Every structure is written in structure tokens, then in C-alpha cells.
Amino acid sequence: MFKLFNQASRIFFGIALPCLIFLGGIFSLGNTALAADLAHGKAIFAGNCAACHNGGLNAINPSKTLKMADLEANGKNSVAAIVAQITNGNGAMPGFKGRISDSDMEDVAAYVLDQAEKGW
């Protein structure tokens, strides 16, 4: 019995525990990267979008805010849809293709969606 327990302990502490620690580290890095992307998105938003969209509003067209209900109503409730809007623009909103990088657009879109989910 003791020999079996000792062998199981070696397996657990030699293989399973290091794997669990490794996986925990990977998941914590993912959350840190996501937080950094949102922070970067917030900074890009402040410099390029807030003049018209401060607080998730729309100074030009008040019926098309960045609030979740309006994003859903206009089919803009995903990162991909928001990136397409930022890239190409539409109506009074200019496109930002070539003005900000694709990764910056993705960070802004993630930030906008996160804020919309939180109610701005």
C-alpha cells in the first residue's frame, strides 16, 4: 500500500503538478494580454474616436451610439463588425484604414465592445 501511494505521489508531484502550474501560468498571461489590449484600445480610442464618440455616444448621429442596443440593432456587436466599421467608415464616419494599424483597430474594437457590455 505504501509503495503504491509513494509511486502515485511521484507521478503527481513529478508530472501532474508541474503541468498544472504551467497551465495556470499560461492562462494568467492570457488575461494580462487581454487587459493590455483593452488599455491600448482605450488610448487609441481617446486619441482618434472620443471627439465624436465620447462615453459611447455619437455627436454626429445620436441614434447610432456605441451602446450595446444600438450596436446590436446595426449589426455592429462583434469585434469583426466594429473593425470593419473602423476600417471602412460609413456615412459621416471616416475610415481609418492606413491611419491606424490593424492591431490598433482590433484593440479599439475590443475596447468598444467591452465598454458596451459594461454599459459605458
Swiss-Prot record:
Stored Gene3D superfamilies: Cytochrome c-like domain (1.10.760.10)
PROSITE patterns given in the database record: CYTC (PS51007)
Domain of life: Bacteria
Pfam families referenced in this protein's UniProt entry, alphabetically: Cytochrome_CBB3
Binding-site residues, heme c: C49, C52, H53, M93
Protein modification: Binds 1 heme c group covalently per subunit.
Gene Ontology biological-process entries: photosynthesis
A GO molecular-function annotation: iron ion binding
Subcellular location: Cellular thylakoid lumen
Keyword Ligase in annotation: no
Signal peptide: 1-35
Main localisation: other
Keyword list, A-Z: Electron transport, Heme, Iron, Metal-binding, Photosynthesis, Signal, Thylakoid, Transport
GO cellular component labels: plasma membrane-derived thylakoid lumen
InterPro entries: Cyt_c-like_dom, Cyt_c-like_dom_sf, Cyt_C6, Cyt_C_IC
NCBIfam families: Cytc6PetJCyano
Function: Functions as an electron carrier between membrane-bound cytochrome b6-f and photosystem I in oxygenic photosynthesis.
Family of this protein: Belongs to the cytochrome c family. PetJ subfamily.
Listed HAMAP family: Cytc_PetJ (MF_00594)
Assembly mode: Monomer.
Identification of the protein by name: Cytochrome c6
Species this chain originates from: Synechocystis sp. (strain ATCC 27184 / PCC 6803 / Kazusa)
Gene encoding the protein: petJ
